[in-house]
């Protein structure tokens, strides 16, 4: 948005318009709410409390009050959570706001189904670790209250993943933009993560070999593939 505005000398103004698809797409699926699981240090190396301490130190060193994470893979890494809200991606549709005093995870999409004990257990574990779980749809109101009430005067966001709807409600005076430190940090794998990657590659290799064997034998036998 800023690049476009600067390129045309500020002559283009973006506005938040109603979602016109809602009128046409009457059977539009609801936001997914798949089971949420948590991972322990034996699976990821760093416990979430350690990651929160790390990001808070980063905020202190930079002189910022808070960071808003909008990239789903970064949120999954920060909280050691996994889901299936996006097909073939182990992520949860959510936003994460970390301040020096609070960790707000906007992930709840309504009541947890009675048969989803996994998510309920995961939420209890997160709450015990100081993660305040909010409704997914409450993120805009929460950000507005924090910024308008001067509770946050230096909010760090990554413009590469921040959507326009959230950008439009943030006071630009209080927003610092840059590359997310979480994406950079999670790219440096610890020993546990490296071991997990090796195991995953082995399993993936076995699956690929089985597929190639099936493909070759099927073609040689004249079967339809």
Annotate each predicted stretch with a short phrase.
Residues 1-225:
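Active-site neighborhoods and metal-handling regions in enzymes and metal-associated proteins
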């Amino acid at each position: 948005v800023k690049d476009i505005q600067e390129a045309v000398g500020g002559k283009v103004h973006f506005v938040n318009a109603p979602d016109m698809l809602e009128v046409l797409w009457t059977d539009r699926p609801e936001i997914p709410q798949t089971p949420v699981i948590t991972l322990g240090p034996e699976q990821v190396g760093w416990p979430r409390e350690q990651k929160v301490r790390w990001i808070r130190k980063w905020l202190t060193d930079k002189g910022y009050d808070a960071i808003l994470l909008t990239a789903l893979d970064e949120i999954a890494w920060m909280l050691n959570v996994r889901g299936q809200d996006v097909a073939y991606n182990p992520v949860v549709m959510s936003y994460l706001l970390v301040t020096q005093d609070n960790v707000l995870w906007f992930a709840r999409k309504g009541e947890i189904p009675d048969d989803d004990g996994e998510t309920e257990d995961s939420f209890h574990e997160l709450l015990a670790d100081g993660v305040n779980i909010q409704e997914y749809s409450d993120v805009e109101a929460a950000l507005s209250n924090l910024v308008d009430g001067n509770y946050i005067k230096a909010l760090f966001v990554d413009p590469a993943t921040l959507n326009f709807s959230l950008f439009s409600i943030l006071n630009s005076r209080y927003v610092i933009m840059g590359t997310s430190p979480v994406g950079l940090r999670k790219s440096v794998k610890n020993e546990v993560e490296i071991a997990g990657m090796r195991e995953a590659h082995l399993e993936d290799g076995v699956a690929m070999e089985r597929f190639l064997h099936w493909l070759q034998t099927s073609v040689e036998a004249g079967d339809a593939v």
